[in-house]
């Protein structure tokens, strides 16, 4: 039995789950999420707890067992609390600002970079060196944060660029002056 897959998923009072043969819908105060289901897993709901079981012990069913348990858990967490990813900008003259619905980034290139987030994602810029990516879908929040980070990844010599909060940049030593 999968260590992750066998754990039950507690439902909060605010989250409601609807299960059909082919898909699953989780609704909460922050929104609604859908997930297509695979025939390798059986999902049941009783007494405010959702459980995931697999139909057999095939390799595919074992993989799907843990995966769907975590996906459903993330959906419940997302519609009740939401997810936030914080990005930090380091570098002289590097900054971010919101212009209309676009995130405008000045990252040392000869031009500004404009980024439009998907409708399900909210981007906030509390100050010029901090970006908050918020939404109910954990995968989409992470994907948007990774896309923003990819515009100027942190470089190892000075650490300039966009990094996740708490990310440790492995630093390199510069060339030693030879004599």
UniProtKB/Swiss-Prot annotation:
InterPro entries assigned to the protein according to its UniProt record, in alphabetical order: Ribosomal_uL6-like, Ribosomal_uL6-like_a/b-dom_sf, Ribosomal_uL6_a/b-dom, Ribosomal_uL6_bac-type
Entry keywords, A to Z: Ribonucleoprotein, Ribosomal protein, RNA-binding, rRNA-binding
Keyword Ribosomal protein: yes
Pfam families associated with the record: Ribosomal_L6
Keyword Translocase: no
An MF annotation (GO) of this entry: structural constituent of ribosome
One Gene Ontology cellular component annotation held by this UniProt entry: cytosolic large ribosomal subunit
Gene3D superfamilies, sorted: Ribosomal protein L6, alpha-beta domain
Residues that span the membrane, as ranges: none
Gene Ontology biological-process annotations: cytoplasmic translation
Described function: This protein binds to the 23S rRNA, and is important in its secondary structure. It is located near the subunit interface in the base of the L7/L12 stalk, and near the tRNA binding site of the peptidyltransferase center.
Family: Belongs to the universal ribosomal protein uL6 family.
PANTHER family attached to this UniProt entry: 60S/50S RIBOSOMAL PROTEIN L6/L9, LARGE RIBOSOMAL SUBUNIT PROTEIN UL6M
Subunit and partners: Part of the 50S ribosomal subunit.
Name this protein carries in UniProt: Large ribosomal subunit protein uL6
Organism placement in taxonomy: Bacteria, Pseudomonadati, Chlorobiota, Chlorobiia, Chlorobiales
Recorded name of the encoding gene: rplF
């Amino acid at each position: 039995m999968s260590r992750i897959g066998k754990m039950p998923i507690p439902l909060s009072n605010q989250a409601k789950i609807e299960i059909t043969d082919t898909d699953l819908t989780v609704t909460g105060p922050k929104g609604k999420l859908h997930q297509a289901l695979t025939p390798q897993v059986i999902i049941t709901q009783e007494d405010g707890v959702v459980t995931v079981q697999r139909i057999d012990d095939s390799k595919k069913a074992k993989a799907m067992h843990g995966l769907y348990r975590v996906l459903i858990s993330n959906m419940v967490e997302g519609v009740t609390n939401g997810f936030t990813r914080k990005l930090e900008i380091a570098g002289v003259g590097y900054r971010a600002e919101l212009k209309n619905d676009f995130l405008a980034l000045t990252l040392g290139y000869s031009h500004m970079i404009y980024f439009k987030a998907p409708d399900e994602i909210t981007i906030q810029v509390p100050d010029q060196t901090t970006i908050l990516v918020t939404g109910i879908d954990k995968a989409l929040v992470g994907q948007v944060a990774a896309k923003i980070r990819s515009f100027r990844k942190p470089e190892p010599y000075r650490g300039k660029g966009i990094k996740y909060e708490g990310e440790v940049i492995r630093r390199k030593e510069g060339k030693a002056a030879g004599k």
